[in-house]
């Protein structure tokens, strides 16, 4: 990323990540609330499920909106490389998480 575009890139990218994090936090809170609420009726649960399953759509909408803005500071190739880097990073994190969980489950307990 050229030096003159870095600041704008990070401002946009951080704003996008913050929006995605808020959405994820709200969705996880809704899931917890519905699990704990033993009095919730089917209508409430259906409404919550719709919101939970809609999270991916909302994430996509946020990413598309920011992709349009990021095109001002990144080339299409750079945007593609960014998406690839995000995917590889997440895959690496998941592998490490699975390895750690597997190691913890196989260690002897006292």
Predicted feature descriptions by range:
Residues 1-73:
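Amphipathic alpha-helical segments
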Residues 10, 60-110:
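Amphipathic, charged alpha-helical segments and their helix-to-coil junctions
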